[in-house]
Amino acid sequence: MQTHEIRKRFLDHFVKAGHTEVPSASVILDDPNLLFVNAGMVQFVPFFLGQRTPPYATATSIQKCIRTPDIDEVGITTRHNTFFQMAGNFSFGDYFKRGAIELAWALLTNSVADGGYGLDPEKLWATVYLDDDEAAGLWREVAGLPADRIQRRGMADNYWSMGIPGPCGPSSEIYYDRGPDYGPEGGPVVNEDRYLEIWNLVFMQNERGEGTTKEDYEILGPLPRKNIDTGMGVERVALILQGVPNVYETDLLRPIIDLVAARAPRGYDQGNHADDVRYRIIADHSRTAAILIADGVSPGNDGRGYVLRRLLRRVIRSAKLLNIDTAIVGDLMATVRDAMGPSYPELASDFDRINRIAVAEETAFNRTLASGSRLFDEVAGTTRSSGVSVVSGSDAFTLHDTYGFPIELTLEMASEAGLTVDEGGFRELMAQQRRRAKADAAARKHAHADLTAYRELVDAGPTEFTGFDELTSEARILGIFVDGKRVPVVAHGQAVDADRVELVLDRTPLYAESGGQIADVGTISGTGSGSSARAAVTDVQKIAKTLWLHRVNVESGEFVEGDGVVAAADAGWRKGATQGHSGTHMVHAALRQVLGPNAVQAGSLNRPGYLRFDFNWQGPLTEEQRGQIEEVTNQAVQADFAVHTFTEQLEKAKAMGAMALFGESYPDEVRVVEIGGPFSIELCGGTHVATSAQIGPVTILGESSIGSGVRRVEAYVGLDSFRHLAKERALMAGLASSLKVPSEEVPARVASLVERLKAAEKELERARLASVRAAAVNAAAGAERIGNVWLVAQRMSSEMTPADLRTLVGDIRGKLGSDPAVVALIAAPAGGESSTVPYVVAANRAAQGLGLGANELIKHLATAVDGRGGGKADLAQGSGKKPAGIDAALEALRAEIARVG
């Protein structure tokens, strides 16, 4: 029975039983605690917790699931997969244990003709939680299972939770006995290879708290209603019904293995375990990568993007280890599409994008792999020559940090080479790097000598931010800090230039930098007896997300802790910042409208008149896409959409479609910014305009890459946009005047001039190459005979580039015939003793036979000119730093040839 038929029978069975069919959710949900959807019930969690009322009493779905904690085990055995399909039926306060057992048993054992899977009831076993007598009794009553085929297990095996706080409850698992070929009898508690788990019925009745293991967590209490959550492994049922030994032989994964086998010189399942592991890695990871890309993930350096990158890199390297030297990822994606497309049509409809992203990662990683593999070989050789078998943490860190070689690949390659890696040392160096980066960032941001100095104020309560409603507020000074140390008073001239002066107020209208929006500037002035005190606010930062630190320059008077003050945000600055921030929301919405929902925000910066927006996307935008994004943005600005801000419960806000950043931690109650109804809805704590027209024109300046899979759009807004356009207009007018053509003809005129310039450059290059060829003829004519060896060893003109030298030595060597011949050319620099000295050596086969290899001869040149070089026996090159040694270098070469030849 094919997998698509297994899926269809499952859904049909439960729909006939009154369940609502619910499509699979994306493997990515707006949940900062969950990297990927890893169970069928995840999309129903709000229903199970009673946070939302389900629109149906019972449901059924087949959910895409991804689990990557044991990614390193994939392929080593046939039990692990990173992607799998979880078929499930769910009851929200409707049926409970009896209904779940009856429905599952019927589907498994009903005949194929009656819509079931036709499994032999005598081969089915069940496990229940230790004290769940009710479930054990139902298995005997409903299914007729004898007591010896119902086994009891503890919390680690038969008490289910997601591994994080949320729903939980006792479970009952159904196993299929695959027979004595797979191990000894005795049931699941004895052997889970022979007795294969195919379905887990969770009797979800409690809510769990935090914990560190499967058994160590607190049961917080009962859920509002008793629920059922079941999960049947589609791939596992497929291997049983298709009569194959493991999931890699099923109709979904075997086509991928067959594709690889057609390209690799060594086949699958030919007695080579290492090769079989590589085949299975490619099959599993290709499928998971395609699903991730289809659901909007792009390769990156952290979070979900890093998982995808790691999967693709393991695919690529496994193919290399199978001696597949040509690109294969595109073919793999097509095979996944063909196998999985009937169940997941997005793999076909979005194939061009999926393929483009995957192939781009292959191209980039092949470059890294080529250089990194050579470097690793050097490290491995040095490690062995030192008489040890452990690659140092320092070497592993250098490979990672300097050359971009992933630690996972270093670990794999070390293992294959019979070495281990000092992971502890590597992790410590990584931690040190992160600490340095964090400390540097903190120093740049806060310049705090001792953060504990602020602890008392942090504990006393948050600063009240009034800036959403007013730009001027009366406040009281809670604390004064000079260079990170608390003081009772600060006066004009008291702090030296290098010191930072910070005022902490109980309330403030000045916005503290956060959410991509830079801080307000403004003033803090004394009141009453302190009316002469005035400070310019140059920056506002947060401590512990609650305390506003106003960095100030005290311009007059003095400030005393406890005094009343008036804090004022600069109105012009704030207006520009709000234009930038609201403009960012508009550009984000336009990006998603033009590019689709996969264009997900990765960062932003908003300052007066300017915005910068980073988003996940593979490849540059076309001119047409840039134009569309700019047009959609400005159309929305001109529509004068109302801007509404309000607070809402996090789950309700997400249900409204509010955009949330993955990896961000949000409180239960969040602030929502809505522009033009559905046009833009985001979770945001920043300041915004009242209507979209107040943003003013938006001009996109450009779009660029800032990392693999991340693009950046920059734009001017408001008056800055107008000024930019005015400059562009003036520039165009100046060009038109200089070129003596109307403005509309400038592009054609410039293109014509560029073509003429290219033609002139080609003519100059032809003349230069003719000069180089003439030099080759002259140099060959000056060949000298040393023993049995012809030698051309000459100083060349400073105009010769390293590429010219390589061309010359090849030409000259070809003119010297079949006798032993060596050519060595050094370009004499024109810049004096500080200039670089390039040199190239070539040796023909006859010279190499005498032991005169270019890679050895070049060392004599390098020594004399204080340089270095390398290459192969036929051709080597290098450069030095000592032009005065050129003559000595050529003489050293002559001496070596005289010695050998």
Swiss-Prot record:
This enzyme catalyses: tRNA(Ala) + L-alanine + ATP = L-alanyl-tRNA(Ala) + AMP + diphosphate
Q: What are its GO biological-process terms?
A: alanyl-tRNA aminoacylation
Pfam families reported for this sequence: DHHA1, tRNA-synt_2c, tRNA_SAD
Q: Which InterPro entries match?
A: aa-tRNA-synth_II/BPL/LPL, Ala-tRNA-lgiase_IIc, Ala-tRNA-ligase_IIc_anticod-bd, Ala-tRNA-synth_IIc_core, Ala-tRNA-synth_IIc_N, Ala-tRNA_ligase, Ala_tRNA_ligase_euk/bac, DHHA1_dom
| SMART domains the UniProt entry points to | tRNA_SAD
> Record's CDD domains?
AlaRS_core (cd00673)
Annotated Zn(2+) binding lies at H581, H585, C684, H688
The superkingdom of the source organism is Bacteria
Please share the entry's free-text remark on the cofactor.
Binds 1 zinc ion per subunit.
NCBIfam families from the UniProt entry: alaS (TIGR00344)
Q: What is known of its domains?
A: Consists of three domains; the N-terminal catalytic domain, the editing domain and the C-terminal C-Ala domain. The editing domain removes incorrectly charged amino acids, while the C-Ala domain, along with tRNA(Ala), serves as a bridge to cooperatively bring together the editing and aminoacylation centers thus stimulating deacylation of misacylated tRNAs.
Protein name (Swiss-Prot/TrEMBL): Alanine--tRNA ligase
> In which organism is this protein found?
Mycobacterium marinum (strain ATCC BAA-535 / M)
